[in-house]
Amino acid sequence: MSVHISETRVVRGACPQDCPDTCAFLYHVEDGKLVEVTGDPDHPMTRGGLCVKLKDYAEHHYNPDRLLHAMKRVGPKGSGQFQRITYDEALAEIKKRWTQIIDQYGSQAIMNHCYLGNQGTLNGLTSGDAFFNRLGATIGEKCYCESGSSTAWIMTVGPTGGLDVESLAYSKYIIVWAMNMLSTNLHAWPFILEAKKNGAKIVVIDPIRTRTAKQADWHVQIRPGTDGALALGMMNVIIAEDLVDHDYVDKYTLGYDELKARAEQYPPERVASITGISVEDIRKLAREYATTQPSAIREGVALERSSGGGDAVRLVSSLPALVGAWRHVGGGAVEMPIWEFPFNFDFIQRPDWIKPGTRVVNELDLGAALTGELRLDPPLMSLLIHNSNPVSQQQNANKLIQGLKREDLFTVVSEIFMTDTARYADIILPATLQAEQYDLAVTWGHLYVMLNQPAISPPGECVPNVEMFRRLARTMGFDDDYWKMSDDELLMKMYDWNAPAMQGITLEKLKEVGWMRLNVGAPGQRTPHAEGNFKTPSGKCEFKASAAANGNFIVPVWRNGYNEMQPGDPVDSVPDYIPPVEGSDAVLAKRYPISLISPKPHAFLNSQYANESVQQRRQGEQTVVVHPNDAAARNIKNGDYIRVFNDRGSFEGKAELSTDVYEGLAVANLGYWPGLSRSGSAVNATTSSSHCNLGGAGCQSDNRVEIAIA
């Protein structure tokens, strides 16, 4: 009698999630089945560790609730009633409906809605751009997060990767600003601990005493949306006490006199009244930051999530040049190192296919577009949604749902599970998970090129996004060579493999080793702006932004590579503090006295994994963190179910009384699926569709509510 002994095959991969860490994976396969996913211990950044979100990633692939086949709606929109059809039948229906819409309304009546449910080059943020540009569709501006920060960062220092996260190990003073790193950038923390071991001081600036804040040497608790005022207050002290690196400022910055004049308007006393931080602490923070070199700032995306978020990022990004922090290894700021990668976006997105005068719609305004508020002509008559679950993740979700219910709206959703968004689809196309697809990861938190190789075959009719768009292109009659290229052929054109940063890196080598570091200097030597070399029009750090002359703009990568039809609204060349609209509205505060912020959860990745029972147990049900005094005033006890509401909508959660928030502030994590929640809604039922002052980003943290026992 023979005994079959399974051999484990190990395949190298990369995490696809919307996270700066982009962990190096090892897929363990036995008899064609994925049995385990572990971290690669040899990767210098991620070092073999996986976050709690990925602990059961192998099982995720075999969840019995996965969508495996194309489906067509047979019940009311939102009911989740579908019948199975073949993939070819789905494509035929899409062609029929799109052809009818184009004939009657024109191609701009169709729009793609996509974000970072996957962050690969082939299958991620830009995976549908070329197809929809070729189709002539309305351009959807992808502004869920980072678009405001990108505009602000580029206006100030240009498209630079800035400080290497690994170089934080050499810092002596580290500010983690608006980021709960232990939940959202876990693999950067060991470098901070290494710096701490060598004497560095760790400061966290955050409205909440988060996991990260509790591990810091000093938690500076700030009111939401007032970060720009704090940065100006720090500048005021630095300038008044002559802690400026005048040599660096004279040589490598533009607009110091104007910035100085602006900072003089924000003495610590004024800033204290705005931010809730004491005068003494503002002075202390400024002095320590300026005089303890090398000093570093890790900027979180949450900086942009209020009305003045864009200028807040500009101001925070200006601090390192003011004190000369860029001179040193471990000095400067890191926002999104993606700019170091030599993407060929002209090929990835094919903006040359965009017809002149094509309109744009910010994805955060989709509800207003669908309900007629934007008065679009032609109206939007069809959507294709992929890499996104907007019913959970988009602000002012009730308005979006109202629009998705339109019977005359033809909606196609590519998904892995029957999400709240998929329930409103007319056609569902099943998508692959990472172990089933090939891709070159887009790493936006470190400097490694990482290849993901498929370890198992896709189940059912599931296909990667890149293949879905090939099939759609053939279905719509597109005969361009682009749609005939293999994945490798596409990747060879999607990057400039001859760029200095890619020296020694080849696709064939990546297939052998999985990952390679960009040639941009070793972490212990890297000083990208020690002598200026900023990628701005002046070549300097621009306290006074040259780009402001043309008004507000969204970086083209967030809008299909399109640089026409930009917002263009006026932008102050010197950044200023812009108060939160709702947070500073005294009349609104009487009706809705609680400020609500909705940070990312610890065990979900945005809304991903929120339907997994294991992750639900780890994260727990929806809670609302409330200060004890606010709870007592409303007779709310710890553990009570409470209703959180305003004019836009409401949701329910379990009260968690804590002094981790200050009086007047409540916290409820985003990511929960409305359909799986107690009240059938989630936190984005209460958030507004308003935008921050730059880059079209949202104001999720500028939200006033009231709370009461449910």
Which residues does each PLM region occupy?
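N-terminal export/assembly segments and adjacent metallocofactor-ligating motifs
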Residues: M1-L243, Q265, R270, S278, ...
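Phosphate/diphosphate-binding loops
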Residues: A14, L400, R406-F410, S414-T419, ...
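N-terminal leader/propeptide and maturation segments of large enzyme subunits in energy/redox metabolism
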Residues: H69-E89, N236, E241-V279, A455-S546, ...
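Flexible, glycine/charged-enriched surface loops at secondary-structure junctions
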Residues: Y105-A109, V244-V249, A296, R327-V334, ...
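Extended redox/cofactor-interaction regions of prokaryotic respiratory oxidoreductases
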Residues: G124-L193, N198-V204, K214, G228-L232, ...
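Short beta-alpha connecting loops at secondary-structure transitions
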Residues: K214-I222, T432-A435, L447-P459
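Active-site phosphate/pyrophosphate-binding segments
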Residues: M234, L254-G367
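Long, contiguous, secondary-structure-rich segments that constitute the structural scaffold
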Residues: P459, P464-V513, S607, E612-V625, ...
